[in-house]
Amino acid sequence: MNKHASQPRAIYYVVALQIWEYFSFYGMRALLILYLTNQLKYNDTHAYELFSAYCSLVYVTPILGGFLADKVLGNRMAVMLGALLMAIGHVVLGASEIHPSFLYLSLAIIVCGYGLFKSNVSCLLGELYEPTDPRRDGGFSLMYAAGNVGSIIAPIACGYAQEEYSWAMGFGLAAVGMIAGLVIFLCGNRHFTHTRGVNKKVLRATNFLLPNWGWLLVLLVATPALITVLFWKEWSVYALIVATIIGLGVLAKIYRKAENQKQRKELGLIVTLTFFSMLFWAFAQQGGSSISLYIDRFVNRDMFGYTVPTAMFQSINAFAVMLCGVFLAWVVKESVAGNRTVRIWGKFALGLGLMSAGFCILTLSARWSAMYGHSSLPLMVLGLAVMGFAELFIDPVAMSQITRIEIPGVTGVLTGIYMLLSGAIANYLAGVIADQTSQASFDASGAINYSINAYIEVFDQITWGALACVGLVLMIWLYQALKFRNRALALES
């Protein structure tokens, strides 16, 4: 019997944990901006600042979490502690109605948990296979697909719980999901005994001040306290500036490490792709902030006598990614003919073009709202689905190129820099863009009147901004295509 005939048993526990982690994270994310504005009565500017700071830090901490796992905790312990912290964070978030300080503390705990979890769950999965095991790619594909299942279900379940019961119930359901995933994972603990555990030698080296686990407890208590400070706007900006400077310094070091012109060109391609990815995600991340508030205020959400909770719309994007991803994988076959760089830029142009089309649909929706008071639900669904489809032509393409680079020992670092720019910096920029929609006035009774014209203007500007990016990418695509054609003609002559 072939020992590679099926996946290792341990993978199913990792997959279960991944499903519930996505459920927990995206369920809470779907509720957060609505909770800040509708329940805590934050003004839009304050809510956007906090939301973007939270989303930015989520993409910074995995770098630290990966370092901690490599040096001290090991992937398995880091994943378990991360899951536990995220569950605790969601519980504390549900209690933030009691006192505002719980809000910042809860988000900080979730960020720390996410940092420990996200960077290490993939590494833990990798430990289940030998380097040459042919099942490896299938295992990672299974984990990715499972995560999408969680992100589809989460906004529906948590949105329903919040709408029918309470905000605490919605956040509590996210916590229950994370706890369920952790319990399932612990039930399969015996399948992970061969994976790398806690580095006791490192812990013993610091035993002269505190017991082994004392240092870990200090870290778990101090880190949320430190990150809580970063949620003030100025400090979060400073943190991103420092992280970006460090990232650029690392890029310069990698460039000097390149041994030939081919490697330098590969690095230049990755840097350029990362820049356009950053702009793409600054537009796409409006889904959790300005678009969510637009849906809540200006879209007719009634369907068959039921008012669809705003949070449920967050499932449309994930569903489109999964459905279109399956279509591309099974129906569209990658051509091996032609130049790979030309194909890469063609895909980026398509992704940015679809993003522009999605926001064009949202602009039409907003204009409809201005004329008739509310926009139609199908138009909103179509716009979000097109934007979800666009994602498939950006991140997978960029990440594939990063893994192809021939400079040894830099793939992980480049992945971290890509996440920093397309995740952390993009989310900060998304907050700046979303804040342009925060125009409101008060009527004679003191009620807030939100400006639909602000949404029209911002959605329209993003439409043209994404289209301008398409133009720039097409110029690069045309240059690469002509260069490839001229090279081919020279070889034939």
Curated annotation (Swiss-Prot):
Assigned GO CC terms: plasma membrane
Annotated compartments: Cell inner membrane
CDD domains, per database record: MFS_DtpA_like (cd17346)
Periplasmic membrane side: 35-48, 99-100, 159-166, 233-234, 288-311, 365-378, 434-461
SUPFAM superfamilies: MFS general substrate transporter
Entries under InterPro entries matching the protein: AA/pep_transptr_DtpD (IPR023777), Dipep/tripep_permease (IPR005279), MFS_dom (IPR020846), MFS_trans_sf (IPR036259), MFS_Transporters (IPR050171), POT_fam (IPR000109), PTR2_symporter_CS (IPR018456)
Topological domains, Cytoplasmic: 1-13, 70-77, 122-137, 188-211, 256-266, 333-343, 400-412, 483-493
Transmembrane segments: 14-34, 49-69, 78-98, 101-121, 138-158, 167-187, 212-232, 235-255, 267-287, 312-332, 344-364, 379-399, 413-433, 462-482
Principal subcellular localisation of the protein: membrane
Annotated Gene3D superfamilies: MFS general substrate transporter like domains (1.20.1250.20)
GO biological process: protein transport
GO molecular function, one term: peptide:proton symporter activity
Keyword Oxidoreductase assigned: no
Membrane topology, from the record: Multi-pass membrane protein
Keyword annotations of the record: Cell inner membrane, Cell membrane, Membrane, Peptide transport, Protein transport, Transmembrane, Transmembrane helix, Transport
Family under the similarity heading: Belongs to the major facilitator superfamily. Proton-dependent oligopeptide transporter (POT/PTR) (TC 2.A.17) family. DtpD subfamily.
PANTHER family in UniProt: PROTON-DEPENDENT OLIGOPEPTIDE FAMILY TRANSPORT PROTEIN, RESISTANCE PROTEIN MDTM, PUTATIVE-RELATED-RELATED
Role summary: Probable proton-dependent permease that transports dipeptides.
Name used for this protein in its record: Dipeptide permease D
Gene name in the database record: dtpD
